[in-house]
Amino acid sequence: MKILLTSDTWTPTVNGVVTSATTMKRELESRGHEVRVLTLSQNSHTYAEHDVTYLGSLDAGRVYPGARLRGPALHGALRELARWSPDVVHSQCEFSTFSPARYLARAAGAPLIHTYHTVYEDYTHYFSPSRCMGRRLAALFTRSICNRCDAVIAPTPKIRSLLLGYGVQCPVQVLPTGLELTRFAVPRDDALRRRLHLPDDKKVLLYLGRLAKEKDISTIISFMPDLPDAVLLVVGDGPEHSALAQLVQHLQLADRVIFTGMVPPGDVPHYYALADAFVSASASEAQGLTYLEALAAGLPLLCRDDPCLNNLVQQGQNGYVWQNPAQLVRLSHTLLCRDDPDVLRKNAVASARPYSSAAFAAAAEQLYRREILRKTQQRQILQREVVLW
């Protein structure tokens, strides 16, 4: 098959959408498919490099940190992709590259598949002064996007239920993003531990991801005074970095909360390997790829209760979910004082196995073939009706 993936972001940007899309591309190519990508450039120039077409874009950081919007006059680049005539178009984002994805799918007579990666109602603080109004706008926007597609992929049952509640009418299939699991099986890097000044006599809690308001990292930092035998390693960057650093100074935790900033994607497994547990206070995850990465690295989870964790965390077996700060403190002590950390690690690795990148691509391939067949049948029925008329 000829498969076009469209995404507003691409490498070297590091986020869940890029991780999912690059994993998809790599695995589909390994199965013999021809895969191209349509994304935004980081400037106003439109160009192509190998199998990736970059559309000129404009800075939209005032709307959302790091965001860009598609520029005008892109017909030449789209005509070239239309001549290539993909068998299926798989959109990953709802904004700048969604309209080109629709155009190219129509031009090729191909099905348009869309993966819903982001729970926009959890991001209302970026675009609406009222959370209630923001939720209504998010539902309206999501419905208008998804109902223009032939099928929608939801990474978890949580997202499928959300979409159906919004009134999405097209077929919605649950398909968790997969990971290259063996990538996270790396030994602990003692030299890296020393460079980060992590004390040998303390347990290491890890948060890895964007530093943004919806991730509620301040809750994790605020409970660190109750865990004197642990340090918190915060890997990543984002718009909340400055506010979180100020909170650390206010709580006098500079020696027990370590910020690394952004790290190269290839180094990420080594940061997981430094930790004893992965901690998160986010309730805005569509799937939570970092949760899967942590499990693949053998880290038990210590995460805020969220429907995306259903069937992923077995309480006390591969981690714990918590519902309030008091529970977080109590369960942190429970986890870090367990006398069977090797059992926790073994259970964590085992629970990540069903989420392999190979299984992810195989399921996507099956969905593509089904939608291509359905599109072909619809076209044949329409042609027969025209002849009869």
Question: What would you call each of these model-derived segments?
Answer:
Residues A283:
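Aromatic "clamp/platform" in nucleotide-sugar-dependent glycosyltransferases that forms part
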Residues C146, M262-V263, H270-A275:
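Short alpha-helical donor nucleotide-sugar binding micro-motif in glycosyltransferases
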Residues P300-C303:
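Short hydrophobic beta-strand element within catalytic cores of glycosyltransferases
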